Design a protein with these regions (language model features):
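Active-site recognition of the HExxH zinc-binding catalytic motif
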Residues: 125-141
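Conserved helix-loop functional segments at active or binding sites
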Residues: 136, 140-144, 169-176
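An active-site-proximal "capping" alpha-helix that borders the catalytic cofactor pocket
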Residues: 156-172
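Short acidic (Asp/Glu) and glycine-rich catalytic loops that position anionic groups and cofactors
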Residues: 104-111, 142-146, 187-192
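Long, well-structured alpha-helical subdomains associated
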Residues: 122, 168-279
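Short pre-active-site segment immediately N-terminal to the catalytic Zn-binding motif
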Residues: 111-128
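Contiguous, non-catalytic segments that form substrate-binding/exosite surfaces or channel walls
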Residues: 1-112
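Post-HEXXH active-site segment of zinc metalloproteases
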Residues: 124, 140-161
Length: 280
């Protein structure tokens, strides 16, 4: 119980929140093979079922508890753990993400994750969470060792997309439990749900979705088809993901000041700075 700032869900600022959760990590043979193939000794992410909690956690779209989002006198210099309420994801995905795509896109482009079993959805979302955090700890600047610089607005947007696109490519390559479903989660949740958050102009995850849409559109991986609806080219998404990750990791090798400047320039190439009187 304490003053917490939620990542999503419409509650702005710090509110007193509380929750009860039960941790569960998938442990069957396919998942053990995944953990062995992508070993993550620094893993501090915990997959869980939200059992009960305050309205901000039970009713909104927020599925994560970050201890660094607690109002406290000092900001942690590293992330100690993160708790994810993945049992909430199915309802969010089926009531927001899929309908959002179906309103504007070709329905046949979203197949593997449509109407999936609740247990499969939970385990697939755990896979996304594991791979996402695995890639946070790869590359020139491991997230846990550079949390101060990587949680700023522009560097953070690029970091989130980098690790999601790396996860997407791994899932598309095969051998990952529920890989096709996870790939759709990543692509459609980022592009369809997050930009529609109520506070989208101030929401970090919304920024990642808008940046991804702009990047994929430039790459020809997503666009308006001859039917007048959006369509995606999954092979082009894979190729764009590889380029994006390479661009980001090249900039991560720069000194801090140059890295921060280059991160802003890269984001502003796709999301221009607002003019007078415009929202961010």
């Amino acid at each position: 119980f304490g003053p917490l700032r939620l990542a999503n869900g419409g509650r702005v600022g710090y509110r007193f929140e509380c929750f009860l959760a039960l941790r569960e990590e998938p442990g069957d043979a396919p998942y053990r093979a995944l953990y062995a193939g992508f070993p993550h000794p620094k893993n501090i992410c915990q997959s869980a079922h939200l059992i009960a909690g305050s309205p901000g956690l039970t009713r909104g779209n927020n599925i994560v508890f970050f201890p660094e989002n607690i109002a406290a006198p000092d900001v942690p210099d590293k992330q100690l753990y993160a708790l994810f309420f993945f049992n909430k994801f199915k309802a969010i995905y089926e009531t927001i993400t899929i309908p959002s795509w179906d309103r504007v896109g070709r329905p046949e482009a979203l197949v593997a994750s449509r109407g999936a079993d609740a247990r499969d959805v939970y385990e697939a979302r755990c896979v996304w969470g594991y791979l996402h955090d695995y890639f946070h700890h790869r590359g020139p600047r491991s997230f846990d060792e550079h949390i101060g610089v990587k949680t700023r607005w522009f560097t953070g947007l690029r970091e989130e997309l980098k690790v999601d696109l790396q996860s997407f490519r791994v899932c598309r390559a095969g051998g990952v439990p529920h890989g096709a479903m996870v790939a759709e989660f990543i692509l459609f949740d980022r592009t369809m749900r997050y930009p529609g958050e109520p506070d989208w102009s101030r929401n970090f995850d919304s920024g990642t979705g808008l940046l991804l849409l702009a990047y994929l559109a430039e790459a020809g991986a997503i666009g308006v088809s001859s039917t007048g609806r959006l369509d995606v080219d999954l092979l082009a998404v894979e190729a764009a993901g590889a380029r994006f990750a390479a661009e980001v990791e090249a900039l991560e090798r720069l000194p801090d000041a140059d890295y921060l400047e280059a991160a802003e320039a890269m984001v502003r190439r796709y999301l221009p700075a607002p003019g007078p009187g415009e929202i961010r």
